């Protein structure tokens, strides 16, 4: 009688061990998924760094001491999100790229060349879409107070730096 119970127990144990052991296909698929996720994170990091560089370059050109039109540019107001903490908040940046391009068009002069203004805006737009996706259903909640173009760029630079510093390496 005990031998029958022992045989049943051993059989059940073996069945449990066989069914719970990972197979080579499930291990390789989870490894492939992990590698794909790591690649996506690396691409996201690269896109964030590119966006950061473009925004920093725009800001440095605007703050150039020879930019005589900066006081005029500072009269234009931009809107920032109430709290930007996620990539979907880049929709708010995308919404303000049109007005930013118009302000950058004012800077065209002999003393301050921003000859690539159109390219900067285009690059920023493409990078933003890559980061947040093409879905435009997210509605940005803008802050009540507006910001100057310099403050606008500084806040988005800080946003990029924050996301980069908190993303897994």
UniProtKB/Swiss-Prot annotation:
Give me the Gene Ontology terms describing cellular component.
Answer: extracellular space
Q: In which tissues is it expressed?
A: Produced by immune cells including dendritic cells. In contrast, macrophages do not produce IL2 upon bacterial stimulation.
**Transmembrane regions:** none
Keyword Disulfide bond annotated: yes
Task: Please give one Gene Ontology molecular function term for this protein.
Answer: cytokine activity
Gene Ontology biological process: activated T cell proliferation; adaptive immune response; cell surface receptor signaling pathway via STAT; extrinsic apoptotic signaling pathway in absence of ligand; gene expression; interleukin-2-mediated signaling pathway; leukocyte activation involved in immune response; lymphocyte proliferation
Q: Which family does it belong to?
A: Belongs to the IL-2 family.
UniProt protein name: Interleukin-2
Resulting phenotype, residue 30 to P:
In strain: RF/J
What this chain does, per the entry, is described as: Cytokine produced by activated CD4-positive helper T-cells and to a lesser extend activated CD8-positive T-cells and natural killer (NK) cells that plays pivotal roles in the immune response and tolerance. Binds to a receptor complex composed of either the high-affinity trimeric IL-2R (IL2RA/CD25, IL2RB/CD122 and IL2RG/CD132) or the low-affinity dimeric IL-2R (IL2RB and IL2RG). Interaction with the receptor leads to oligomerization and conformation changes in the IL-2R subunits resulting in downstream signaling starting with phosphorylation of JAK1 and JAK3.
Q: Which residues are glycosylated?
A: 23
Keywords noted in UniProt: Adaptive immunity, Cytokine, Disulfide bond, Glycoprotein, Growth factor, Immunity, Secreted, Signal
Query: A single Pfam family, by name?
Result: IL2
Phenotype of the disrupted gene, per the record: Mutant mice exhibit lethal autoimmunity and are impaired in regulatory T-cell production. After 4 to 5 weeks of birth, they develop a thymic disorder resulting in the disruption of thymocyte maturation.
Q: Hey, what's the signal peptide range on this chain?
A: 1-20
Q: What induces it?
A: By bacterial infection.
Which cellular compartments is it found in? Secreted
Task: Specify whether Acetylation is a keyword of the entry.
Answer: no
Q: Which cysteines are joined by disulfide bonds?
A: 92-140
